[in-house]
């Protein structure tokens, strides 16, 4: 801590893409008040943990880091300031202050504008002082703040915040409040600026983007997506996350009709059993989900689909689990985020249902789901061998500096020989091999698109 700048900050970001976007917002707010972003934690006199509360494992990771920072704070004789932001403080304020005395201040997702004031208050009050700003603000969308972005190639643009769905297992309504949408004009202005700055890819973000609605512009998400596509015609456009019950034919047609909107849809289903979906309060049946899949594939024949799955939810039987495996086989998702259920305090499931599936059985069922999905992914990816795909190069491959990795419009990862290319280039690659998670290929031409 001897060389750490007391006005320099470093942000550890956990969890979803929205948290990554929020870290950029916090960075902008702090820099506008004269604070300096440090390139590593050791140089920072202020350390922020931007946290996720969706799963117990994410909370545990934050706890481990706070223990590490406790030791560092002792060595600094209390000069290091530690703040916890994001979903965990909104959800577990008293637990944080009680169990982790290293924490000086807390800020929830709607109160990041208060960060400079919180820091000043703690600095002025001295050792042992704690501050918190955790009020929900149903109007806060951080419009007017230009986020600091870690990439000059790919950008996240939040278009709405919060969620009204109240799925039984989910903490998001408790941590991010009710839905509110960014004004259409503000979204389009940000998109145009990014396109003019040369960004190759823009991802529209929301806990449930399909619920987007700007009452002033009378604009729903399908209409916003079309407008974004036209505002940045040379830029790839993605969006996440969608709720199956809110996928409309108008939205699917918009994707099909605009060539720069990526042909990939992430559509979390969570279980293959309608009975379990009812307990989860998902608002749809498996039959209705499959109707949405059929609609998507009828209008976007080359679409790729991904999903989320939860193994071992309350009351899940072996028959329910087998229904999940059958759904995977029927839909043929490209990929899936797969977890076993862990109850989150204050959620409907934790308060009203019994967590009656033994942990060992949860883990066994999860492993079966993973193995099933890996087989499907490997089969789908092997079918791409011999084809030519357009790839946006994103970064150096983890395994070799002589290779780059990038993604197709369908969100498939491709690793290929560098051949003079660099991140940000768009090129055609012939697929020569595959694994269950990656396509392997060779660039076709020596000039970028």
Curated annotation (Swiss-Prot):
Would you tell me the protein name for this molecule? tRNA-2-methylthio-N(6)-dimethylallyladenosine synthase
Question: Could you tell me the EC number(s) of this protein?
Answer: 2.8.4.3
> Where's the Radical SAM core domain?
149-379
Q: Does the keyword Methyltransferase apply?
A: no
Listed binding positions for [4Fe-4S] cluster 2 are 163, 167, 170
Which cofactor(s) are needed, names only? [4Fe-4S] cluster
Q: What is its main location?
A: cytoplasm
Question: How many and how are cofactors bound here?
Answer: Binds 2 [4Fe-4S] clusters. One cluster is coordinated with 3 cysteines and an exchangeable S-adenosyl-L-methionine.
- One of the record's GO cellular component terms: cytosol
Q: Which organism is it from?
A: Chlorobium chlorochromatii (strain CaD3)
- Entry's InterPro entries? Elp3/MiaA/NifB-like_rSAM, Methylthiotransferase, Methylthiotransferase_CS, Methylthiotransferase_N, Methylthiotransferase_N_sf, MiaB_methiolase, rSAM, rSAM_horseshoe
Q: Which reaction does it catalyse?
A: N(6)-dimethylallyladenosine(37) in tRNA + (sulfur carrier)-SH + AH2 + 2 S-adenosyl-L-methionine = 2-methylsulfanyl-N(6)-dimethylallyladenosine(37) in tRNA + (sulfur carrier)-H + 5'-deoxyadenosine + L-methionine + A + S-adenosyl-L-homocysteine + 2 H(+)
Please, which domain of life does this record's source organism belong to? Bacteria
UniProt subunit comment: Monomer.
Where does the MTTase N-terminal domain start and stop, copy by copy?
7-124
This protein's record includes keyword Transferase: yes
> In Gene Ontology terms, what is one molecular function of this protein?
N6-isopentenyladenosine methylthiotransferase activity
- Tell me the keywords, alphabetical order: 4Fe-4S, Cytoplasm, Iron, Iron-sulfur, Metal-binding, S-adenosyl-L-methionine, Transferase, tRNA processing
The family classification in the record reads:
Belongs to the methylthiotransferase family. MiaB subfamily.
Q: Name one Pfam family in it.
A: TRAM
Subcellular location field: Cytoplasm
What does the UniProt record say this protein does?
A: Catalyzes the methylthiolation of N6-(dimethylallyl)adenosine (i(6)A), leading to the formation of 2-methylthio-N6-(dimethylallyl)adenosine (ms(2)i(6)A) at position 37 in tRNAs that read codons beginning with uridine.
**What positions does the domain TRAM occupy?**
382-445
Give residues annotated as binding [4Fe-4S] cluster 1: 16, 52, 87
